[in-house]
Structures are given as C-alpha cells and as structure tokens.
Amino acid sequence: MSDNRSHIEEKYQWDLTTVFATDELWETEVVELTQAIDNAKGFSGHLLDSSQSLLEITEVELDLSRRLEKVYVYASMKNDQDTTVAKYQEFQAKATALYAKFSETFSFYEPELLQLSESDYQSFLLEMPDLQKYDHFFEKIFANKPHVLSQNEEELLAGASEIFGAAGETFEILDNADMVFPVVKNAKGEEVELTHGNFISLMESSDRTVRKEAYQAMYSTYEQFQHTYAKTLQTNVKSQNFKARVHHYQSARQSALSANFIPEEVYETLIKTVNHHLPLLHRYMKLRQKVLGLDDLKMYDVYTPLSQMDMSFTYDEALKKSEEVLAIFGEAYSERVHRAFTERWIDVHVNKGKRSGAYSGGSYDTNAFMLLNWQDTLDNLYTLVHETGHSLHSTFTRENQPYVYGDYSIFLAEIASTTNENILTETLLKEVKDDKNRFAILNHYLDGFKGTIFRQTQFAEFEHAIHVADQEGQVLTSEYLNNLYAELNEKYYGLTKEDNHFIQYEWARIPHFYYNYYVFQYATGFAAANYLAERIVNGNPEDKEAYLNYLKAGNSDYPLNVIAKAGVDMTSADYLDAAFRVFEERLVELENLVAKGVHND
C-alpha cells in the first residue's frame, strides 16, 4: 500500500512554503486578489480612452494574472500531493473560481482592443513608447480578430468556464481519489495494492504472470466504470467543439492549434508520416516476441524490458547521473539543475492520494517544481531528466523574459524535455561498449520512441477522431469508444483486438484526452529533440548557444520561429523522417545483437 505522506522524509517533498509560507497567507492573498479583481470591473469600456489607459489597464491585467497564477499553483500542488484532503480540494476549487472571475472581469479586454484601428494603434505607440514592449502581445490578439465575439458574448462564455472544465475535473477526482484497484502480487509474490504509480513498474516485470494480473486488474476496473468515463469524455469533447464553433473555427483542432499559431498540416503530417512508418513498429513487436520467447505477444508484454540487465537507479543515484549528463549544456544550465535537485523543487515518492504520473509546474514567481512518483528504474531516470528539461526551460524563460512573455507554447515545451532524454541516450551509447549494456540502452530508446512517437500519435489520431465523430452527430458511448480504440490499437501494434480484449478500455485512463489537442506535441517534440540532441552532442558551441537561446525566448516570438532559430523546421516532414531513420538504425543494431544471442547470455 502507498505510504501516507507523513511518512516521507521532508527532503523528498517539494517546498511549497517558498510559494506561500502558510495556508493563511494564501487565504489572505485570495481575499486581496478577489477585491482587486472586483475593483478592475470599472475598466470596462475605457481601454481605448487614451494610450495611457491602454498601458495602465494592460499592466493591471498582467499583474493580476501573475498573482493569480501563483495562487493557483499553490492550491493545485497542495491538492495534487494528496487528492483526498478536503481542505486542498476546496483551495483548488477557490482558485479555479477566482480564475473564472478574473476571466469574466477582463472579458472586455480583447473585444475592446480589437476596435482599435491600425492607424490609431501606431499613434498610441508614438504617444506612449512603453507600449512597445507589448507589441508582440498585441499582435497575437489582433491576429485572433475573426474569432473574438462581442463583449457580452465573451463575458457569458467566461462566466461558464467552470462548467466547461467540469468534465476534466470530474475525471481527475474519479481517477485519482475515488478509483480503488485490486490487490495484486508483485514479482516477489508479495501482495500490493495496484495504483497508478506502480502500474507501469508491474507491467515492466519480467514475470509474465505479474504483468497479466496487473493488466487485467487495471482494465477490468475501468471496464466497470466505462460508462461514466465515456460520459465525462463525451462532455469534454462537446465542450471543446461548442467553444470552437461559437468562435467561428471549423473544428476544435483548428481552435486549439491556432492558439499557438500552429497550422493543422503539422498535425496531419505527423499522423500521415507515423502511419507510413508503422511497419517499423510491427517489426519491433516481432523482435520483442522473439526475445521474450513467446508464441503470441499480448499487450501486457509490450512494456517489459527485453534486457535482463539490472539497470535500476535509486533516486539519489539518478540525481547524480542526471547532473553528469546535463553538464553538456554548460555551467549556467548545470548550476540551475543543481538548485532544482538540492532546494526541494521535486516531490519524489508515491503516497496515498497523490496525483499519478509526473509533471513540471509552477508560475513566473515560483520555482519550477516537479511532481514524480518514483520507482527505481531506468525509465524513471529518463522521467527525471525529462521533467528537469521542462523546469529548466521555465527557469531560463522566466529569467530572460518579462512576465508578458514569461511562458512558452506547449508546442515547444515537449522539445526541451525530450531533448534531455535523447541526450541521455546519446551519452549512454557513447560511454557504453559492452554488448549487454548496449542492448539494454537500445531497448530503452526503442521503447521510449514507441511510447512517445507511436503511442502519442495513436492518442492524437483517437482524439481527433472522437472530436470529428461528435461534430458529425455520433454519440460517444463506451461501446463506440471501445471499438474505435481497439481498432486503432490493432493498426498500430499489429496485435489483434480479439486477442487483447482489455486494451479497448485504455482510453478511459488517459488524462491527456481532457487537455484539448495536447498529446500530438509529445510526438513532434520527441522527433525534433532527436535532431537537436545529435547536434548538441556532436556539434559545435554555436549549436548549444542556439539551443539555450530557444530556452530563453519564451513567448517573445511565434513558436515555429523560436524553434527554427534552434535549427528545426517544424513545417516539414523532414524532422520526422530523420527520427525514424534513427529508430531504424537502432532497431537494426538491436536485431544484430539478438542474432548474436546477446539476449540469451
């Protein structure tokens, strides 16, 4: 059973007192922020009174947004560390409600700004040079003009933001707080409570009985609740489609991608290119079956490492290795990594009620915190360098950009994290000459590629399909979702849905389906990271400098322009094809090692 949080050493818990020293200070800030937002209601109708009013109201909005983010970070992270604590559920609800109030109060901002003509805008810039620093901020709003409604309509929608977000919040509570999974046996024969945190480590077990039991226990539980999960997912899809439609977008995908100025062709190119290369995944599945010595490969066999090498890392060992590997970026990067590792930015271990998975979070005025659910595996070492990549991206951006540009597009976010993963792989393959160790590292890389490019593209294809289906009037019942997911899974892995009954329920446990066209960026990011990591490891100092400049750029330019400066053209399929070339090269090396019998040694 997962430990209670009180049993975990303080050094392995994130230090949220650096955000607010006490809960009482958080509550005081909520009261003051609520009053400040109320006071801002008088701005409505006055944004364009003068260049001075445009500057002042813009800066008040940004200041309140900055304070609100800090309030939300504290509440959400307190809740995430133990989702069963009612007090912090209430804190998160208050923070969410305050966001809705803020959005409603400033719903006048964009409609009023868009009444400004180009000539009047230029006059304002001449009168008030301080407005120049917000030029790109304004430019992005002007680009959105065809999709902004009247002030009353935007105010109405802003007031309903909690309703639109309710499906995702219901999913989180159901999945993290209410779901109870059976007791299963681990490889030692010990009975353990199945959790989100230990599921993957059980699926990585070399004991097929352990894998099968955990797999069936997990998905049979989701089977019991499939209709509830279908309703929450359907409601979320309907919300996204509705918001896109009323804002004059052709689809929810167009709406989501346009927020980051990403053309839909990037998404289509990803799915088309990955589908073209699915034979490589089928080939890897055949190799996996051969190495495992199985007559038939099942979905509960796709996570277990092919290597029997004991590449386990305690958390402290993983910290040391990560610092060694990431030193390649130079002193400035290394110094910030050390701070993250020693100043309690990270919440490390599994505990009862803790949110599953891993993430990097925080706001402009906080540390770039990380949530983990640590298991002593090579995969968790990769998770650590991945989340550190996010946190260092956030740190460099906040240090080098004003608040207005002090964040970055999610399209760019996954590049920073997976570049770190690929640098870890490149470094390990350069260091290791022994066949058995190379086998283990290659296996991990191929599994990571499978999980990041193939799997996330499968998710992206499913996500778009259900949005299109809803647009066309299809009711997203559990039966429909199960069938669609099973067919896609068979296409990707080449393993029949008849022989893998339980996998049809996997869609129910994927939180990213509530994030509105997020998952495709894991795949595009990993592919771009493949290219960047090779340049950083084998290139010249200018390549590293270009990469650090990308980390520092934040939202000061459009995402495709920012990453182009680092050397990647995301409008082309070339970066994807380059990634598949690396995958095939490493697959060939693994096939050759298998032919030599390395896996039997």
Swiss-Prot record:
Enzyme superclass (EC): hydrolase
Record-annotated active site: 387
Enzyme Commission code(s) on record: 3.4.24.-
Subcellular location: Cytoplasm
UniProt KW NAD keyword: no
Segments crossing the lipid bilayer: none
Cystine crosslinks: none
Keywords: Cytoplasm, Hydrolase, Metal-binding, Metalloprotease, Protease, Zinc
Free-text comment on the cofactor: Binds 1 zinc ion.
Binding residues for Zn(2+): 386, 390, 393
One Pfam family matching this protein: Peptidase_M3_N
Named cofactor requirement(s): Zn(2+)
SUPFAM superfamilies: Metalloproteases ('zincins'), catalytic domain
InterPro entries given in the database record: OligopepF_N_dom, OligoPept_F_C, Pept_M3A_M3B, Pept_M3A_M3B_dom, Peptidase_M3B
Single Gene Ontology MF annotation: metal ion binding
A GO cellular component entry from the record: cytoplasm
UniProt entry tagged with the keyword Nucleus: no
An annotated GO BP: peptide metabolic process
Top-level taxon in the UniProt lineage: Bacteria
Described purpose of this protein according to its UniProt entry: Has oligopeptidase activity and degrades a variety of small bioactive peptides, including bradykinin, neurotensin, and peptide fragments of substance P and adrenocorticotropin. Also hydrolyzes the synthetic collagen-like substrate N-(3-[2-furyl]acryloyl)-Leu-Gly-Pro-Ala (FALGPA).
Family to which this protein belongs: Belongs to the peptidase M3 family.
Name of the molecule in the record: Group B oligopeptidase PepB
Organism of origin: Streptococcus agalactiae serotype V (strain ATCC BAA-611 / 2603 V/R)
Gene coding for it: pepB
